[in-house]
Every structure is written in structure tokens, then in C-alpha cells.
């Protein structure tokens, strides 16, 4: 079912103690609130088992930032989808541009990650988006369509369980932001691609988040677009006042 969502991506930030403190602070900030969106925090693996029981599950969902493309076994340093799920986490970010760029994650690797996440009851937040050169060459639709191949071999039933997140890679951590019109244009293209593959009903029920330097000052304008269903938030998720300011954009 299509929902408004604000999901925080902590990336490689916060020690265990700092992460616990941040989660507690967010939980307290929302204690007397009824957000008009689903709120999710995606944390480094070390935080999951500590943070999940700390927050009010009715208001804050918890997820990981990645999982392995293998079920289990001799893969030193990897963390499986089953391990993530065993902490009580419900979500996992997959296909983030930083993992595609720095760790060589391909369409095939991501297919396996998505399937394992779903098999273990996790909701994938699947990221797609173009770099600056691709945007300047007007190839953003072509790039995004190719990235969607990682999830377009799912059954309609499984696809309906995922959340999509569009990242204009050129806007991540740069302070640049796609204009509301640019965001709406690419989100509408993504929804039309989903409709072409799975039909209008599933497309209309798919949440598509915006993930590029979203902050309290621009969130309301971005979220006002008909095909923008919330945000995948990086830097602003590390400060409760900023993160709550984005959540409040739906109020």
C-alpha cells in the first residue's frame, strides 16, 4: 500500500553509544506526536539489536543500510538478511549509489540481495538514480530504467512489498537539490515504468521516495509533488531537529 515515508540513512556514522542516544532522542521527540508518515531509521549493523527495542515500534521502524547477497556461510565480514531480521529490524536499504560506486554492486548482485531480503520478511528500500554526467547527457530515464531491472524480475506480489527511492546522485551530500519539478518529472517516469511492467494498480500503490539533499527548508515543496511520497534522508537524519522538521513537512 502506498504510504508517505521519511526514512533516515545514518550511513557510517555514530558509535554504538551515540546511536543509542540519537534513537532515544528521536523517540522522545515523537512521543506526543502522530506523524502523518511512516518514520524509519536505517542504521549501521552494530546499532540494530540495541536501537530496535528502544524505539516505539508503532511510530519508528528500524532498518539496515545493506545486507549480503548470500544466505550464510564462509563470507567473512558479511551480514545476511536473516541476521538483520533477527534483530527485529523490518527494513533494508539496497542499491544505494554509494554501494554501487564504491563496492561495485551490479544488477545481478542486487537481484540476489532483494530476493533474500524479501525471503526474510524485510522491506527493501531500493535505490535508483543517475550521476551528474548522465543527467547532463539527458540519460536519467535510461539509467533508472536499467537499474530497475534488479527488481523487475520479481513477481507482482513481491514487487508490491518494496519501496523505491530515487537518488539524484549529483545532489547527495553536495548541497545541490533537484528542483521540485525535476523530482516530480523523474518520479512520474519511475511510476510509469512500474505501471508498464506491473500495471497501474501496483504503480499507484508503490511509494517512491526522494533522496537528494532533502532538508526541512525544502521538504514541504518536494513532498507536495503527486509522485513524491517522502524522502530517504542522509545528513539531516543525524540531527533530530532537522529530521523531525522533515517529518513535520507532512503535517
Swiss-Prot record:
EC number(s) stated in the UniProt entry for this protein: 5.3.1.1
Which pathway does it serve? Answer: Carbohydrate biosynthesis; gluconeogenesis; Carbohydrate degradation; glycolysis; D-glyceraldehyde 3-phosphate from glycerone phosphate: step 1/1
Compartment annotation: Cytoplasm
Which of this chain's residues are annotated to bind substrate? 9-11, 173, 213, 234-235
Task: Name the CDD domains for this protein.
Answer: TIM
Return the PROSITE patterns for the record. Answer: TIM_1 (PS00171), TIM_2 (PS51440)
Query: Does Cytoplasm count among this protein's keywords?
Result: yes
Catalytic activity field: D-glyceraldehyde 3-phosphate = dihydroxyacetone phosphate
Sorted alphabetically, which keywords does the UniProt record give?
A: Cytoplasm, Gluconeogenesis, Glycolysis, Isomerase
Q: Where is the active site?
A: 96, 167
**Top-level taxon of origin:** Bacteria
Q: Which GO terms describe its biological process?
A: gluconeogenesis; glyceraldehyde-3-phosphate biosynthetic process; glycerol catabolic process; glycolytic process
User: Transmembrane stretches, by residue range?
Assistant: none
Q: What class of enzyme is it?
A: isomerase
Could you tell me what this protein does? Involved in the gluconeogenesis. Catalyzes stereospecifically the conversion of dihydroxyacetone phosphate (DHAP) to D-glyceraldehyde-3-phosphate (G3P).
PANTHER family xrefs: TRIOSEPHOSPHATE ISOMERASE
Q: Which family does it belong to?
A: Belongs to the triosephosphate isomerase family.
HAMAP family named among the record's database cross-references: TIM_B
Oligomer and partners: Homodimer.
Q: This protein is called what?
A: Triosephosphate isomerase
Q: Which gene encodes it?
A: tpiA
